[in-house]
Amino acid sequence: MVNLVEIRDLKVEATTDSGRRVEIINGVSFDIAEGEIVALIGESGSGKTTIALTLMGHARPGCRISGGSVSVAGKDMVTLSEKQRARVRGTEVTYVPQSAAAAFNPAATIMDQVIEVTRIHGLMSADEARLRAVELFTALSLPEPETIGSRYPHQVSGGQLQRLSAAMALIGDPKLVIFDEPTTALDVTTQIEVLRAFKSVMKKGGISGVYVSHDLAVVAQIADRIVVLKGGETKEIGTTKEILDGAKHPYTRELLSLIHI
């Protein structure tokens, strides 16, 4: 398989209030193949979101990428200029946030917001973008896909808004989508429905994914492989089946003891 993402010896530093630098990501390395969905899992503070953001060339406020490389489709996101990164974001690499509500402007229609990235980057005509959006609404099992785009964010459910957030990320046919705990606020039944819809569209399109979560039961629904993180370090990497059926690291087994799949 061809790798879309290659992270090598990634290090990220944070600056404390006293001005001291602390390494919060310490030498993390892993790959993501084309069309593969990889989950980053660990407790709060394990570094999973920090690592995911480096795939867009981002560092959190007060942090900096201090070492290693982050390659996406042959581009090192660490060394690209900000102008070059801006071209990659929204086209080759996209992001689905934890809060779909925060991603939408309450005063604009859903359709206008979903297709906005295609206008910004000149990816297709407005008519083509609207047709593509309806295709995605259908593929993501949204009700009334032909007309849901004319609604406003407050007129759809939380689960529907999360799927629409995914449609926004997928509209430009990206190579990689980063999902940052997007189903946390949903009930279990809705979570499963949304995850299945995400996975179906990703697999049909051959799109790679990074799924950030603290919940192994959730990632079992969508991930091909799992990277277990603690304290900014990799503790275990394996296929979802390998991790669920034969976890080797004590921390992974601890996470498994908290779930029922």
Question: What feature does the model see in each segment?
Answer:
Residues 259-261:
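Conserved small/polar residues in nucleotide/adenosyl-binding loops
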Residues 192-205:
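Helical segment within the ABC ATPase nucleotide-binding domain
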Residues 234-238, 246:
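ABC ATPase "signature
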Residues 219-221:
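A short, surface-exposed alpha-helical micro-motif characterized by mixed small hydrophobic
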Residues 64-76:
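Conserved ABC transporter NBD signature motif
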Residues 171-175:
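A short, proline-enriched helix->beta-strand linker immediately N-terminal to the Walker B motif
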Residues 114, 166, 177, 190, ...:
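Hydrophobic anchor residue at the start of the ABC signature
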